[in-house]
Regions:
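Charged, low-complexity intrinsically disordered terminal segments
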Residues: 16-169, 173-393
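Bacterial N-terminal signal peptides
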Residues: 4-14
C-alpha cells in the first residue's frame, strides 16, 4: 500500500503520463520458411543436409550492415527482429526505413526492442505500428513516461521487475536466413560514429538452426512483458504515417554523406549472394537463449544451457564474450572439460576495450580461477592497429 502511494506521488510530482496496464496482445507466430525468392534460392544453393547449419562470420562493420540491408531488400514473407538497442541515428534510420519499405511490399515485419535505452517517442512508435504489416513491441516498459524524475522513482520502487532487460539480438528474414551476434543497431556498431565505434562480430546463418531461432523469437514476442507499440499512444492514427515517413526520408537525405557507402533505396544484392557458398562453414549448430522472464520471476539461466552444450564438446570449446563473469558451476564445467583433453579458449575484453569498467572490475576477480581451471584466457586489445603497425614496421 505504501509503495502504491509513493508511486502515485511520483507520478503527480513528475507530471507523468502512464501506460495502460493490460493492453490487448494479439498472439502471432513465425511464418514457415519461404519456398521462393532470392533468399530461398540462395539457401537452397548451399545444399545443406537435414539438421545441418551454414555459418559465416560478419566481423567487418560495413559487411554486417550490408547483409542486413540485403536480407531486408529481398524479403518476401516475413522479418522478425529483436534488439536491446535501436538508435535513431544514420544506421538505425536507414535500416528502419528499409523495414517500412518491406512492409509496403506486403512483408510482415515484427520488431521487438527493449525499453531501457529506447530512442524514440511513444507516439511515433504507435504511429508506425498502425501500418497493417508492421508491428513494434517494447520489452518491459516502465509505466511512467515522459518524465526523468518519474522514471527514476518508478525504477527505484520496482527495481526487481524493471531490471529484467532483454539483451537478445537476432534478425530473421523469410525464415531462411538469420543474423546473430554482438551488434545492436546504431552507428557505433557499424563504424559510422564520429565519437567511438565498437568492434563486434555477428554470424550469418542458414539451415536447420533458423527455424529454431524463429521459434525462440516467438516466445519473446508473445511474452507478457512484450508491450504492443500501438498501445504506447492510443491517440496515434494511421493518417499520421505518411508524414512520419517523410521525416525519415528527409533525415536520410540530410545525412547521405555519412551513409555514402550504402544504397539509400532497395537494390538487387544477388552478386553478394553468389559468393556465399564459398564462404560458409558447415556443421551442427545449437541455438541458446534464455526464456523471457515472467512477472512471477520464473527464468532459465543461459549459463546452465552453456554448461549443457559444453558437456557435448569433444575437442575444443571457444567462449567469446565482452562481459565474462563465470559462475562456480561454469568454472567446474571448464575444469572437467580440460581434464578430458578438451582445449578451452576464452576471449573477453580488456579494461581498455571495455565500455563497462564496473563489469571488468568484477571479471578481474575471476582471472586466476579461470586459468586455474585450465582454460586459455585472452583479452581483446583496445589498440590492435598499433600492434599490427609494430609488426609491419
Amino acid at each position: 500500500m505504501i509503495r502504491i502511494l509513493v508511486f502515485s506521488f511520483v507520478v503527480m510530482v513528475g507530471g507523468c503520463t502512464t501506460l495502460q496496464p493490460d493492453p490487448v496482445r494479439n498472439i502471432s507466430h513465425t511464418i514457415p520458411p519461404a519456398s521462393s525468392g532470392a533468399l530461398a534460392e540462395t539457401a537452397d544453393k548451399l545444399r545443406l543436409p537435414p539438421g545441418v547449419t551454414a555459418a559465416m562470420p560478419l566481423s567487418a562493420a560495413q559487411e554486417a550492415l550490408d547483409w542486413r540491408l540485403a536480407l531486408v531488400d529481398h524479403a518476401i514473407t516475413s522479418i522478425d527482429i529483436q534488439y536491446f538497442i535501436w538508435s535513431s541515428d544514420e544506421a538505425g534510420i536507414l535500416l528502419f526505413d528499409r523495414l517500412m519499405q518491406a512492409a509496403d511490399r506486403g512483408v510482415r515485419v515484427r520488431l521487438l526492442v527493449d525499453d531501457l535505452a529506447l530512442d524514440g517517442s511513444d507516439h511515433n512508435i504507435a504511429v508506425y505500428s498502425r501500418h497493417p504489416n508492421f508491428e513494434i513491441r517494447i520489452y518491459n516498459p516502465g509505466r511512467v513516461r515522459k518524465s526523468a524524475l518519474g522514471g527514476i522513482g518508478e525504477f527505484m520502487l520496482y527495481f526487481r521487475a524493471l531490471n529484467r532487460r532483454m539483451h537478445n539480438k537476432l534478425f530473421v528474414v523469410d525464415n531462411r536466413f538469420a543474423i546473430l551476434g554482438g551488434r545492436n543497431i546504431g552507428n557505433p556498431y557499424f563504424g559510422l560514429s564520429k565519437k567511438y565505434n565498437n568492434r563486434d562480430m555477428d554470424l550469418l546463418l542458414a539451415g536447420a538452426i533458423v527455424p529454431e531461432i524463429s521459434q525462440a523469437f516467438d516466445k519473446y514476442w508473445n511474452a507478457e512483458l512484450a508491450y504492443p507499440g500501438g498501445a504506447m499512444s492510443p491517440s496515434a492514427s494511421i493518417e499520421e504515417l505518411p508524414e512520419r515517413r517523410k521525416v525519415l526520408e528527409m533525415y536520410l537525405e540530410q545525412h547521405s554523406e555519412t551513409l555514402s557507402s550504402y544504397p539509400m533505396q532497395r537494390q538487387d544484392w544477388k552478386n553478394l549472394f553468389k559468393l556465399l557458398p564459398q564462404r560458409v562453414d558447415i556443421g551442427k549448430g545449437h541455438f541458446l537463449q534464455d526464456i523471457p522472464v515472467s512477472h512471477d520471476g520464473r527464468e532459465l539461466k543461459l549459463v546452465d544451457m552453456i554448461d549443457q552444450i559444453a558437456g557435448e564438446s569433444h575437442e575444443e570449446l571457444i567462449l567469446v564474450s565482452p562481459y565474462f563473469i563465470p559462475t562456480e558451476g561454469l568454472l567446474e564445467s571448464i575444469a572437467e572439460q580440460v581434464s578430458r583433453g578438451v582445449k578451452v579458449k576464452i576471449l573477453t575484453g580488456s579494461l581498455g576495450s571495455n565500455n563497462h569498467t564496473a563489469v571488468h572490475s568484477h571479471y578481474r576477480k575471476y582471472r586466476r580461477k579461470i586459468l586455474a581451471a585450465g582454460a586459455e584466457l585472452y583479452e581483446f586489445r583496445h589498440d590492435p592497429s598499433e600492434h599490427i603497425r609494430a609488426i609491419s614496421d
